[in-house]
A protein has these predicted regions:
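Active-site-proximal loop/helix segment associated with metal-binding centers of metalloenzymes
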Residues: 95, 109-186
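Catalytic cores of nucleotide-sugar-dependent glycosyltransferases that transfer UDP/GDP/TDP-activated
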Residues: 9-13, 129-145, 186, 190, ...
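Core catalytic region of metal-dependent phosphoesterases/phosphodiesterases
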Residues: 6, 12-107, 184, 188-195, ...
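Short, solvent-exposed loop/turn segments at secondary-structure junctions
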Residues: 10-11, 41-42, 71-73, 118-122, ...
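Conserved beta-sheet core of the metallophosphoesterase superfamily
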Residues: 63-67, 83-86, 91, 95, ...
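Beta-strand-turn-beta hairpins that frame and shape the catalytic cleft
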Residues: 1-4, 104-115, 162, 219-223
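Long, low-complexity, intrinsically disordered segments
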Residues: 258-279
Length: 279
């Protein structure tokens, strides 16, 4: 079994990076996992396009896992069937697509993985989107979800292997700013301050996030992902890996796609009757 981690896919817009044209899936099975660090974007209104791309993911030779970002259809997402999977609560989105809920701890392939989705949309988004339709107050975790997270971490002794979030803790701001000016759009806020309190208490090996549209190590043990895919090392070696040197990181970045991933996949066709193949 293998675990891969990547950044936002924004429905079909950035999904090409996990297509066979950009990501070698040779030998993978449904016991291998691709984790998306938020802004999954394929659960909004149950449209034909969303159904097509969920079927496309089901046809891939891996299981897709994701934490939520700020660009999700929370009304539909939170209405999906819930179940316990690998020790934590999930929404089952498709046969092999699962939403890893907030404040959960999962045991996956020898890793203990804490998940805490959510982030605040930009002021521009809030002004130009429609509340309850294209942006939701649920994008930022509420008090109950944060209490659940604390309870989960208490039970785990404030110790885990990996943390998967959408936005980063506030202390990562300096590292993010070295690579992008997106903090002007998505500044650190009350929720990233709360994530900071988690980071300050938690013993962990590595923290992955999305949101900032960069591929960079933004703190000693924190990596932001967007187009790149990180393949986790075996748990035994990963747990000994701490630091900024590539040889000591608990993951290996897969080779960068030769072309812009968006150009490597045929976009959704409006006539679904012609979509006999999910390749």
């Amino acid at each position: 079994m293998s675990i891969f981690v990547t950044g936002d896919i924004h429905a079909s817009y950035d999904i090409a990076k996990i297509s066979e044209s950009c990501f070698d899936t040779t030998g993978l099975t449904k016991d291998d996992y691709v984790i998306v660090c938020g802004d999954f974007g394929l659960v909004w209104n149950n449209t034909a396009s969303e159904q097509y791309w969920l079927r496309w993911l089901d046809a891939r030779p891996f299981t897709t896992l994701f934490v939520d970002g700020n660009h999700e259809g929370f009304a539909l997402l939170n209405s999906l069937p819930e179940t316990t999977w690998n020790g934590g609560r999930v929404h089952q989105v498709a046969n092999s697509v699962f939403h890893l809920q907030r404040g959960q701890m999962f045991d996956i392939d020898g890793y203990r993985i804490f998940t805490m989705g959510g982030a605040a949309s930009s002021q521009y988004d809030r002004e130009h989107r429609v509340l309850g339709e294209t942006w939701f107050t649920e994008e930022v975790p509420n008090e109950q979800e944060r209490a659940t997270a604390i309870e989960t971490l208490d039970q785990a002794g404030w110790n885990c292997d990996l943390v998967i979030t959408h936005c980063a803790p506030t202390s990562a701001a300096k590292g993010i700013s070295k690579h992008t000016d997106r903090l002007e759009i998505h500044p650190m806020d009350e929720y990233t301050d709360w994530l900071q309190t988690i980071q300050d208490r938690l013993t962990y090996t590595h923290w992955f996030c999305g949101h900032y549209h960069i591929d960079a190590q933004i703190q000693e043990n924190t990596t932001a992902l967007y187009n790149r895919i990180a393949m986790l090392k075996e748990p035994e070696s990963a747990n000994d890996a701490k630091g900024s040197d590539a040889s000591t990181l608990p993951y290996q970045l897969l080779a960068e796609a030769a072309k812009e991933p968006k150009h490597e996949i045929t976009d959704y066709a409006t006539d679904l009757d012609d979509q006999d193949s999910l390749e």
